[in-house]
Amino acid sequence: MQESKQLTPLMRQYNDIKSKNTDLIVFFRLGDFYEMFDSDAREASRILGIALTQRGGVPMCGVPYHAAANYISKIIKEGRKVGICEQVGTGEGKSKLFERKIVRVITPGTVIEDNMLQSNVSNYLVCVFTDKKGWGAAAIDVSTGEFWVTEQADDISLNGLSCMLAALNPAEILLDKITLDRVKSSMMIPGSVATTIVPREESSQIPSNWPSQSVWAGKKTALTCALTAIKYINVNEPGFKDLLIPFYKEISDYLALDENAVRTLELVSQNGARKGSLWHLLDFTVTPMGGRTLKNWILNPLLNLADIEKRQNCVSNFYDNPLAYEELKVILADISDIERIMSRVGTGNAGPRDLAGLARSLAVHGALKNWFDKYGAVVPYLKENILSKITVIEDLANLLNSAIEPNPPIKISDGGIIKQGFNAELDDLRNTKNNSSKTLAELCEREKAKTGISTLKVGFNSVFGYYIEVSKGQSGKVPFSYTRKQTLTNAERFITEELKEIEDKILHAEEKILRLETSLFDSVRKHLAEHIGVMRSFAKAIAELDVYSNLAHCAKVYKFTKPVIDESNILKAADLRHPVVEACLPLGSFVPNDIDLGGETQISVITGPNMGGKSVYLKQAAVLVILAQMGSFVPAASAHVGIVDKIMTRIGAQDAIAMGQSTFMVEMKETSHILASCTPKSLILLDEVGRGTSTFDGISIAWAITEFLYKPHGGGAKVLFATHYFELTDLENKYKGIKNFHAEVQEYKDADGQSKIAFLYKIKEGAGDKSYGIHVGELAGLPATVIVRAKKVIKDLEAKKGTSVSKKEDDIVGDLFSSPIVEEIKLVNTDAVTPMQALQMILEWKKRINS
């Protein structure tokens, strides 16, 4: 950076502003461009892919102000904040600079513009603080007005926080240094999420429009989070302060899905994209609010049986009334994003097209009322909710319909927003502007008739404005009401009061029209803002209507059935399918499977080759639970789902390179978390646990984990354990609640007499006996020379050992588990051992085995 004395006045002004806003990329207004300088320019150039230039040795780049929103959006998506620095006043004298200041700060969590947001994705700002034993949080989507708080005072491991963040996928997180240090090691905040260090706003002063003091009793951390978040928002978007009212959300009312489960089950994304996820498959919603609500339901399945049945019954009613869905879909298609429009209305940022969209949305009130008259029994509680607001909706619809043009320009300053007939003064001004020639001609004819001056005419020049001109010969007929304005050689020019009024109207009509239109538009907007609570409630009800009808439609399209839901520990389904995988395959080619857990079987050990369908089997069990507990029908011929409190997964390999952790270390940490957190109501999915180390280490760990999870007399979590360790099948003989299954494979000879296999994708009861690894390699396209060599090596090994490799390993492991070590394992009180102690025991046993 240049020395201060070498800087131009403009750059000194910029540096002064930037020094006070070091965390922002400053969009510095210069005429028709926003310019960025120095480090901001370098970063913006990289993010935006625009040219980096120099002026006076200072790096700079710029974007047109009228297209700034697109560029700001790209920067926000990178997790950065933008400060809009505008010219707010003119300098004194020609040499003086424009006065400039930051007029708005846009952060990833405070965006409200549609073109910076995804229509069907919530945009959360989350504030999190931890204390000695737990944590509190506030979650706000300023674009919709959603605002809730929660607290878990007894979650020292922060498991609940991890699940909450996984479900929210926040755009921005506020925390203090203490909290950051605690959550950093757990990797629960992705690197792409913007994080801001803020001080805690601890105050006993609760805003008057918030819930009363009693709601916050014992929830000090949650209240602190709420106050801190509001203070942060108020700095960046002052208009929101009085529009955001929190409610308390008990997250223990929802099925817990941690980040691993959300990611590996591909609930809302697959490899970062929405396509290929469960959400994408299920989303036939018509409104943006419906799309966001559907995603929220997928990530937050319910635990309360009555609430689940309430949703399920609404879906079932739509399922039984397909015409109700078809007719509702037509109505909902005209509804815009009411939630986000109303947030912009409340802050005074709603534009003409926002109100035009709102007008179209509210115009459905008549059709919606008729629909409820016809199909109200389908969703009785929503009927009452929506119809109670119909009078207000109708009044607002009438206001918008009479006031706002249906296809207005983007900006208020472009004019043409207010409808003809809404305001008499505006109509008069427009008539004056549009009919000025006609008005002047009519005046001229009236004055000729009144005065009898046949040569009278009306004219205009830039010096004197409008005038009435009379020839010298007829000037004697001019009435006393005329005021002389100019004398010419052959004529006299006059002005009258009426002509003055017409002149004023014509010359100032455009300015007055714009000023009056702006005032009228603002008046309509303020009137709408008075009903923001009703409108948000209406939008929420519309979203639920959309989702209920959508889920019924999915049930028809994908041939889902209504499951039995209860408080039991049963997880049972006949002909269960994975709906996303099924949708990717040719019609009718997906192979369904049965599942039966929680009765006689607590743990299913599933063996078989890669590509045999084990992982899909695990995932479809989880999808079954999620769909059932969100109130949906399920992809099975029949299903019985006892409510599950947590779905915990250890599926797939993932290095934590940034944390210096190997695949195996990540696997062990995730497994340790599962062992420490599961309950008898949990569903655990384990896929190839232990494979990241040596064979004996892996077998030992997998064996010990299975024993740790096993609880006699139905006291343990439901577990599906897919493994290549065939040795684990011995556990079925030792424990009554463990049962073996295998992925079925068909062996056959091809035309050349070569052994081949076909995957049948059927999960059958009983243990598998081969891994078919070489066959899988062949199917995957390994070079023929590699396959031939592998077959020769395994034959040589089997010949050398005098038995098959797999049989020999079975014998070794059999010896291992008949040794004194197994007696020690039997004596371990698994209820009293922590996951870390269990792993230490395993390492000790390993040392003794190797010695």
Curated annotation (Swiss-Prot):
GO cellular component terms listed in the entry, alphabetical order: cytosol
Pfam families registered for this protein in UniProt: MutS_I (PF01624), MutS_II (PF05188), MutS_III (PF05192), MutS_IV (PF05190), MutS_V (PF00488)
Ligand binding (ATP): G608, P609, N610, M611, G612, G613, K614, S615
Any one GO MF annotation of this record: ATP binding
Top-level taxon of origin: Bacteria
Annotated GO biological process: mismatch repair
Entry-linked SMART domains: MUTSac, MUTSd
SUPFAM superfamilies: DNA repair protein MutS, domain I (SSF55271), DNA repair protein MutS, domain II (SSF53150), DNA repair protein MutS, domain III (SSF48334), P-loop containing nucleoside triphosphate hydrolases (SSF52540)
Assigned keywords, A-Z: ATP-binding, DNA damage, DNA repair, DNA-binding, Nucleotide-binding
Family: Belongs to the DNA mismatch repair MutS family.
Role summary: This protein is involved in the repair of mismatches in DNA. It is possible that it carries out the mismatch recognition step. This protein has a weak ATPase activity.
Protein name in UniProt: DNA mismatch repair protein MutS
